[in-house]
Amino acid sequence: MEPVCVKDFTLPELEEWVQGIGERSFRARQLFRHVYGRGVRSWSECSDLSRMFRVQLEHGVELDALSVLKKEQADDGTSKYLFGLRDGHSIEAVLIPDLPRSTLCVSSQVGCALGCKFCLTGSLGFKRNLSAAEIVDQVCQVQRDLGSRSRITNIVFMGMGEPLANLDSVLRAIRVIAEPNGMAFSHRRITLSTAGLVPQLRRLGRESPVNLAVSLHAAENELRAELMPVNRTYPLEVLMAACREYPLPPRKRITFEYILLDGINDDPKQAKQLVKLLHGIRAKVNLMPFNPHPGSVFRKPSEQRVLAFQEALQNARITTHVRRSRGGEIGAACGQLVAEYG
């Protein structure tokens, strides 16, 4: 039997698999509870399974898709996990405590192909997509590390990679994470952030009710294309049309993320352009002062410019928050993930 990873299976797929090896379908629900409820480290811990079934699992089904290579913790409590993959690549995930919430930022790719100019991850280039198991296991491994001390309450696809460029694996991972017989995460507590791959954005709206965040960072095409090459393929008018058509539950809004770059996109004129761009969309805005990293040509704007930009949006009745950097001293802040080991 070719080895498989249990975390690659949705529950219906696992039910089909266990029936294929001669077991009854309810065994799949037992496995989900052991893997995601109890966090077992070995199939031998599953004492309610027959010895023969456990032997089959031990010889053909892997429990983990990745391993923790390194963990760093910042003074503010933010933790960065470096994970090793079986092919030698590595990725990072970040746990951000903000009581009573504890948010895990997960990666969806090794590297990223989009090449956003302000993002250190983009400088790595694209290596490969993650499997569903490699996405799910980031959640499992961090929760295993936390133990009974704390629970992950929110998951955000804002780590390494563009989630919509790996949508098949991301949707499969979300189905596993949200499965009531497993981790039972509410879709309301899962957020996916995208630079704006429009066809995949439309598919996401049809297939998964997770929260949507759009990385915007400029309100006019020329500047956005300079900062984010994806804008040349899907310019703002195309992206915003897709956002206007995106299916939103009552009282839900799309989050628009806007990194403030000193002297680039942070003046009052651009705030007005952003207000105009968001007209007619149920939107909220997260402003993020740039997190400096080695080799970057961009600078963090002054607090005065940040607050002035926020005020301009709030005066237009757009809910606007300033997201303060977390974990910057360990390279865990937004746009800083590079998965270096050493």
UniProtKB/Swiss-Prot annotation:
Specifically methylates position 2 of adenine 2503 in 23S rRNA and position 2 of adenine 37 in tRNAs. m2A2503 modification seems to play a crucial role in the proofreading step occurring at the peptidyl transferase center and thus would serve to optimize ribosomal fidelity. Residues 98-329 form the Radical SAM core domain. It comes from the Bacteria. Binds 1 [4Fe-4S] cluster. The cluster is coordinated with 3 cysteines and an exchangeable S-adenosyl-L-methionine. The keyword Transferase applies. This is Dual-specificity RNA methyltransferase RlmN. [4Fe-4S] cluster binds at residues 112, 116, 119. Disulfide bonds join 105-334. S-adenosyl-L-methionine binds at residues 161-162, 193, 215-217, 291. It holds the Pfam family Radical_SAM. InterPro entries: Aldolase_TIM, Elp3/MiaA/NifB-like_rSAM, Methyltransferase_A, RlmN_N, RNA_MTrfase_RlmN, rRNA_lsu_MTrfase_RlmN/Cfr, rSAM. Gene3D superfamilies: 1.10.150.530, Aldolase class I. GO terms for molecular function: 4 iron, 4 sulfur cluster binding; metal ion binding; rRNA (adenine(2503)-C2-)-methyltransferase activity; rRNA binding; tRNA (adenine(37)-C2)-methyltransferase activity; tRNA binding.
